[in-house]
C-alpha cells in the first residue's frame, strides 16, 4: 500500500467541514444540525477569547489542581532495565482522571451558550463523575446516561454521581455499554434542543466535538513538554497512552505531533484476544464507517452493523475511536497496538507494588505496553506515559478477576 504523502503539519486539522483527511465530519439528524452549528459558532468565538482561556486556566489551577506532576518512576525503570519511564500524573486531578479538563471547558461553553441543563454519557463512570462535579460547581442539573452493564460494574462511581446531585439513567438497550449510553444521550438532546447542552466525554462525535475535546485535553501535552524539558533538557523518545474514544491520548500527543523525533503509541483494548469479538481494538481490527455523527474506524460486521466489544476496562469498551486517531493511524504518525485483559491486570499489580500508585485499568493497558517496550530501549532513552486515571473505581473488578475478597 502506498504511504500517504506526509502533511507539512499534523496539527492543522480538522478542516472547516470537521474532517481529518477522510475521517470526522458531522453526520447528524436534521433536527440536530442547527444545534451543532450553534455550538461551532460559540466554540470558534470562545477559543479566540482571552477571557474564556483565563477563566479555564484559573479553574484548572485552583479547582482541578493543574499542572499535574510529571513523575519519574524510578523503581519501575530499574525493574524494567531499559528506558527511563515518566508518568504524566492525570490521576491526581480533582475527580481522579483527565476527564475534568474537558468537562470544565465544556461547561464554560454551555454557560456561554445560555444552556441550563447538562446531559452526558459515561462508560467507566469517570466522565459521568466529572460532568456531575462541574454541573454541581456551576449549579446546573445533570443527567448521565450509563449502560446498565457499566452501572453494575462501576457501582462506586454511580454512587458518586448521585451524591453530586446527578440523575443516573441506566440504559438497557444493546449490550448496555457506552455506545448505547451515547445513543440515548443523542436522543435526549434531539428532544430537548432548546435548554440542553450535551457534554460529550471523548474526542469523538460530530464536529466540533473532536476538535474542542482535543483542545481542552491538550493541556496534558503542553505541560508535559515544559516539564520534560525542565527535567531532562530534551523531548521524550516515546509517548504512550491508552485509547478508548481517545481523548487522553490525543491530549498528550497533539502538542508533539510535529516533533519528528517523538514516537507515539496508542494502546487499545485487546480484551480476550483479537480472534473473536471480545475486544475493542477498532484501529487494529476494525474498518472505517459512520457512528455517532462521525466517520472513523469501527468494530462492525460485513453488513455495517456495530459489534459489541469487550474490555476488562469499562472506559475502553467503545466500538469506535476519535476520528483524529483514525487519520493519524492512516498517516502513519501514530502506532496503535492492542493489549489483552490479562496483560493490563498484570501491569496494574506491578505498578501498585513497585511505585505505590494504584492505576485505573485504562492506563494499565498503556503501562502493559511500556513494560514490553522499555526493556528493548537504551537507558538514555525516555518514555512518557499518560497515567490518565486512578484505580479506586476498579478495585472490585480487579478483586473479582484475581478471585480475592474486598
From Swiss-Prot:
Residues with PTM N6-(pyridoxal phosphate)lysine: 99
PROSITE patterns attached to this UniProt entry: TRP_SYNTHASE_BETA
NCBIfam families: trpB
Function: The beta subunit is responsible for the synthesis of L-tryptophan from indole and L-serine.
Keywords: Amino-acid biosynthesis, Aromatic amino acid biosynthesis, Lyase, Pyridoxal phosphate, Tryptophan biosynthesis
Reaction equation(s) it catalyzes: (1S,2R)-1-C-(indol-3-yl)glycerol 3-phosphate + L-serine = D-glyceraldehyde 3-phosphate + L-tryptophan + H2O
Cofactor(s) listed in the protein's UniProt record: pyridoxal 5'-phosphate
Cited InterPro entries: Trp_synth_b_CS (IPR006653), Trp_synth_beta (IPR006654), Trp_synth_beta/beta-like (IPR023026), TrpB-like_PALP (IPR001926), TrpB-like_PALP_sf (IPR036052)
Protein's UniProt keywords contain Lyase: yes
Summary of subunit composition and partner proteins: Tetramer of two alpha and two beta chains.
EC number: 4.2.1.20
Family: Belongs to the TrpB family.
PANTHER family in alphabetical order: TRYPTOPHAN SYNTHASE (PTHR48077:SF3), TRYPTOPHAN SYNTHASE-RELATED (PTHR48077)
Origin species: Chelativorans sp. (strain BNC1)
HAMAP family: Trp_synth_beta (MF_00133)
Originating gene: trpB
MF terms (GO), sorted A to Z: tryptophan synthase activity
Name of the protein in its database record: Tryptophan synthase beta chain
GO cellular component, one term: cytoplasm
CDD domains: Trp-synth_B
Gene3D superfamilies: 3.40.50.1100
Pfam families reported in the protein's UniProt record: PALP
Enzyme class (EC, first level): lyase
Pathway, per record: Amino-acid biosynthesis; L-tryptophan biosynthesis; L-tryptophan from chorismate: step 5/5
